[in-house]
A protein has these predicted regions:
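Basic nucleic-acid-binding interfaces
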Residues: 54
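Active-site region of the double-stranded beta-helix
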Residues: 6-47, 60-294, 301-340, 344-362
């Protein structure tokens, strides 16, 4: 591990989009241009178990990951989209979904009957609501489904020795060949604009991953008000996880069968984040991600996302040996049956396989 010291006077990420005052306390995230993120710099940050933002990643891509590209190349493919508020789903084509990006005029909230014959979906068949195409492709390996995108993504990621499937410092790349390896991605996360106001379920509800992750935004339409599009992230420190769980159990009694974070049932809107701060002094890294920006999320960091515009993102999981948030911890994983969960814990650099039975204790 590098002994490189992090300069406390470094420029932090200028998080607030124009016209969006945010009065809640938040941690500031370190940022680096893609060209300046070296392995020693990354290791110095990663040893602290804190998230990191990288700028200018889009310059490394050769393919334009935009709605037009996906309409042209995959528009006739069938896909399942999910409504962010209700979790209901429907089958449409990829083209139906992406043609709505940036078209806000006819959109209506879920539950609205709409004045238009198409139900508020602009002729797409989507109907009212905020729709997302997540974990795409859902079952097929990304490399097999989209070989050209896989190659483009692999050559564009920052710190490839850690992030790529075949990265020499990625423990997941050393998984035994004679076993079924976990699907660590890449996966795409495409969602329409949502809101972080009272009652919103966001775009991705609060959850925690057992693997490290890199999430890159490749495209954002302008927001409904015409401002540059972005997505708002809340990332919570590992050491605040127990307070976060206590708050969720107190605030949402009797809705969790298992761990309240891993259940992925709650989005902490502005009012809930305010209450969390006032009661427990827990704040998040509040980060506004824009096109070309990549966020590194350490394993064990609870996080949630709300798209403030229509956004396209691609993410991949990886494993390192220095996960401060997981060492010495029991990881709570919500399981409803006897499931073989592959957990790549850094025990002497070897992969470990654990069988989890029943809902674990926090």
């Amino acid at each position: 591990m590098s002994s490189l010291q992090i300069d406390p006077d470094e420029v932090f990420y200028p998080s607030l989009p124009s016209g969006r005052p945010d009065t809640l306390p938040a941690y500031k995230i370190f940022r680096y241009p893609s060209t300046q993120l070296t392995v020693p710099v990354f290791q110095a940050h990663w040893a602290k178990g804190t998230p990191l933002l990288i700028e200018g990643v889009l310059e490394n891509f050769e393919i334009e990951w935009t709605p037009d590209y996906f309409i042209r190349e995959y528009g006739t493919q069938s896909c399942i989209v999910v409504e962010c508020q209700t979790e209901t789903n429907k089958r449409v084509t990829v083209g139906d979904f992406f043609r709505q990006f940036g078209r806000y005029d006819n959109r209506q909230p879920v539950g609205s009957s709409g004045d238009n014959a198409d139900g508020g979906g602009g002729g797409s068949g989507l109907g009212p609501g905020t729709w997302k195409l997540k974990d795409w492709p859902p079952s097929t390996d990304f490399k097999a489904a989209f070989p050209e995108l896989y190659d483009d993504f692999s050559q564009a990621v920052p710190i490839p020795s850690y992030v790529r499937r075949d990265g020499t410092l990625n423990i997941a790349s050393h998984f035994p060949k004679n076993t079924v390896a976990p699907d660590l991605g890449p996966k795409m996360y495409n969602a329409m604009a949502s809101s972080d106001q009272k009652g919103s379920k966001g775009s991705t509800r609060l959850h925690m991953d057992m693997a490290d992750a890199l999430n890159i935004m490749t495209y954002a339409a302008n927001a409904p008000d015409g401002s540059p599009g972005c997505a708002a992230w809340d990332l919570f420190r590992c050491e605040d996880s127990d307070k976060l769980r206590t708050f969720l159990k107190e605030r949402f009694r009797n809705i969790f069968q298992h761990d309240p974070i891993h259940s992925q049932q709650v989005y902490l809107d502005y009012e809930l984040r305010k209450e969390l701060w006032e009661k427990y002094q827990v704040r998040s890294y509040r980060v506004y991600q824009r096109p070309g920006e990549a966020i590194f999320i350490p394993a064990g960091v609870a996080h949630q996302v709300v798209n403030l515009a229509d956004c396209i993102k691609v993410a991949i999981d990886f494993r390192t040996k220095s996960e401060q948030g997981l060492e010495g911890r029991r990881v709570a994983v919500a399981v409803y049956d006897v499931v073989c969960v592959v957990i790549l814990f850094p025990a002497g650099g070897a992969a470990a396989e654990a069988t989890v039975k029943g809902p674990p204790q926090c």
